[in-house]
């Protein structure tokens, strides 16, 4: 019998499997538009840190997509809460708060990995070769952990789908464009760099891009991202405990 976090994770996988063809199409459109519009139309002849712009862009898209798709698990949780009342069933089930959070977080991380795989496949079609080493995937997984955990926590706090949309607008969208995904932060004023340095996506972009280029990765990036992942996961467990009571 499937029980604990595996039951939660398996349920989300079944939902994802049923929607996978449409999801693949949806996950492909935005990266393809970014690659064509920014990588070719605007990035021709542009060199950043010794790489073409499209080479610089793809690791940024990986960081951004792993963030957005991991965070999207929050919408799935809210649909289950508001329409199917799945959370009420969980409240009555002998499943610990940590197991529930772990199952949902793993589902969000799985979505993120699938979306990242599509971006990398598109990059190969555009002739971009990156070093997909262990550090690269560790950065993707940590980034996904942070935002999937945050999504679970916020999904327990919001009261409606409009509240969830506001979270996307105020949290995810700014980080998607200001976290070093589309341009190097060194081009911004120092005070803005200081503000952006507290964002987990900034450190995720640094890890993923440096790993993809075979460059050294600052230990600060690892510590901040891992710390954010731990804090967000514990926060999610506490919020679920409060919602369950």
PLM feature segments, named:
Residues 1-127, 131-134, 138-206, 210-245:
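Hydrophobic transmembrane alpha-helices and immediately adjacent juxtamembrane helices
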